[in-house]
A protein has these predicted regions:
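Transmembrane helical cores of multi-pass ion-transport proteins
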Residues: 1-427, 431-432
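Short, contiguous clusters of charged residues that form electrostatic/catalytic patches at enzyme active sites
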Residues: 28, 186, 190, 467, ...
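Active-site-adjacent beta-strand anchor residues
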Residues: 76, 131, 517-518, 543
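Generic hydrophobic alpha-helical segments
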Residues: 86, 167, 469-473, 549, ...
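Short secondary-structure capping/turn micro-motifs that flank functional sites
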Residues: 334, 524-525, 544
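The feature marks cytosolic C-terminal regulatory regions of anion transporters and related permeases
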Residues: 365-536, 554-557
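Short acidic-hydrophobic, aromatic-tinged amphipathic segments that line or gate anion-handling sites
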Residues: 536-552
Length: 558
């Protein structure tokens, strides 16, 4: 029986905690907090909520994920992966619908952890992950074109194709000043790593372009550059905790979006934790991480936040700056809280074009175009799943993409697994070289008596194997008296295989054919006995070795 698996890394991290580690965590937390600020604002606005909700998410979820998660260095908060799904939920269900969906996603994540699904989630097929991640990146870029170029247009359609049609129709409405701010911001962020490894390019771009826009407005009379303050009213007041009203109809309608948030959050957080493990030489606890993520996504919306998960970029920033325990993540949350309380009003001066530039760079990083092009050289089945997930993400939505992608991957997996099982007929004699289910090693071959058919199954006996078996039996011309089925290389049998084997035995008995099993291992034999196979065939027709099975066949045909 599986035990309850909730062991936050915070508990083990503080056992041997010392001043040197604390100072390293403090410095890392301070830097990560500063790095997280522009991203939290940008992700919040891009998701369709106010900028302070993005910061509140980073504060609340960041604290909980560090305190209760299964990774020592994971930094949590809003991420680009959620932009598409969050914006879609808000458009369809409103802010209250998003709050309920996030709460439900938190419950799902806790359930994943309690059911020990942490390891399984990491094995979601790579083409699906690349497909929807690349699709999200393209969608994020598409949503930022208007602000990046300062297009003077009243509204932007929600449909992907319609967006680009409208953009094409409004090329003459580009504001050159806003476009300049957006493109220069992209250039600053892209070139910043060459000059500074510690200070993030997004922060440099926001500071430089905010000051530049203030100067342009003050001394050059430029008023066309839109800022956060032009679109939102900024508040630095912490919201009260509120629980939304839940109805059964609302819950039913939000199951699919909530499950998408949970799956997406689980994948991203566990990928981030795995990458971090490789850098610091540690091993995260996947199930504890999922439970911590779940609690964070329950607490965050209660305080007005949006979905959160582990963020790879912020986690790596934490590691690169010396963070080695969850204390660094908690410090990062405290730094963001102080900025929120005392400096939030200054955010109103940040240009929207600059934030769009930040998200354009984020979308480029998410696109994974190298992985995408590499997968295009893989088998056609992988390419099909990749392209299907990608196009469903950008044309429809992420919920549909993940659902269809996983179904397709499961079908392909079933087909590939069925191909691993080989069923063959042995016609004249049995080669005992390197055999494992015979007693008389001094014989090299055993002859098959007349009136006896011998079949050998190599691999798991489940879906697919049964059909191969039936097709192969149909090729024999004469009806035998005995059918021997060698199962020495069958590691397990599932309910489908059991059903097929039982039907084959019943049909054989109706035709007057005796079925003899040979070389059944303990695990498979236990399944057969639970299904009363020894009564169906008779104990004497279940043999440990092929030579015993042939001896039994000789008795039956004599």
């Amino acid at each position: 029986m599986k035990t309850f698996d909730f062991k936050p890394k915070m508990v083990s991290a503080i056992r041997n905690y010392n001043k040197q580690t604390f100072m390293a965590d403090m410095m890392a937390g301070l830097i990560v907090g500063i790095v997280a600020l522009p991203l939290a604002i940008a992700f919040g606005i891009a998701s369709g909520v106010s900028p302070e909700k993005g910061i509140i998410t980073a504060i609340v979820a960041g604290f909980v994920i560090s305190a209760m998660g299964g990774s020592k260095v994971q930094i949590g908060g809003p991420t680009g992966a959620f932009i598409v799904i969050v914006a879609g939920i808000i458009n369809q269900y409103g802010m209250q619908g998003l709050t309920i969906a996030t709460l439900m996603a938190g419950v799902f994540l806790i359930g994943f952890g309690l059911l020990h699904l942490g390891t399984i989630i990491k094995y979601i097929p790579y083409p699906i992950i690349v497909g929807f991640t690349s699709g999200i990146a393209v969608t994020i870029f598409t949503t930022q074109v208007k602000d990046l170029l300062g297009m003077q247009m009243e509204s932007v359609p929600s449909d992907f194709i319609e967006k680009w049609i409208v953009y094409g129709q409004n090329l003459m409405n580009i504001d050159p000043w806003s476009a300049g701010v957006g493109l220069v911001s992209v250039a600053i962020i892209a070139s910043a790593p060459k000059f500074s490894k510690r200070i993030p390019g997004s922060l440099i771009a926001i500071i430089v372009m905010t000051v530049a826009v203030l100067l342009l407005k003050q001394y050059a009379g430029v008023t066309s550059i839109e800022t956060i303050g032009d679109r939102f009213s900024i508040s630095s007041q912490l919201p009260d905790a509120t629980v939304p009203e839940l109805t059964w109809e609302t819950i039913k309608g939000l199951v699919a979006p909530a499950l998408t948030i949970a799956i997406l959050g689980a994948i991203e957080s566990l990928l981030s934790a795995t990458v971090a493990d490789g850098v610091i030489g540690d091993h995260h606890n996947s199930n504890t991480e999922l439970i911590g993520q779940g609690v964070a996504n329950i607490v965050s919306p209660i305080f007005g936040g949006i979905p959160a998960t582990g963020a790879i970029a912020r986690t790596m920033t934490n590691i690169n700056n010396g963070g080695r325990t969850p204390i660094a993540g908690i410090v990062h949350a405290v730094v963001l809280l102080l900025i929120f309380l005392f400096l939030m009003p200054l955010a109103q001066y940040i240009p929207m074009a600059c934030l769009a530039g930040v998200l354009v760079v984020v979308s480029y990083g998410m696109s994974g175009w190298r992985s995408f092009t590499a997968l295009m050289r893989n088998p056609k089945s992988d390419i099909t799943v990749l392209l299907l997930t990608f196009f469903l993400t950008i044309i429809f939505d992420l919920t549909v993409a993940i659902e269809v992608g996983i179904v397709c991957a499961c079908l392909l997996f079933m087909r590939r697994m069925s191909e691993t099982t080989d069923v063959k007929a042995v016609y004249d004699e049995i080669d005992l070289n390197e055999d494992t289910d015979m007693e008389r090693g001094n014989l090299e071959h055993l002859s098959i008596p007349k009136g006896v058919e011998v079949y050998e199954i190599n691999g798991p006996y489940f879906f697919g194997a049964g059909n191969k078996f039936e097709d192969l039996m149909g090729r024999y011309g004469n009806r035998p008296k005995v059918r021997i089925i060698r199962m020495r290389k069958v590691p397990f049998i599932d309910s489908t295989g059991m059903h097929n084997l039982e039907n084959m035995c019943l049909m054989s008995q109706k035709e007057g054919i005796t079925v003899v099993l040979s070389g059944v291992n303990e695990k498979v034999e236990a399944v057969l006995r639970r299904n009363n196979f020894h009564k169906l065939l008779g104990e004497e027709n279940i043999c440990n070795h092929i030579d015993l099975a042939l001896a039994r066949a000789n008795e039956l045909v004599a």
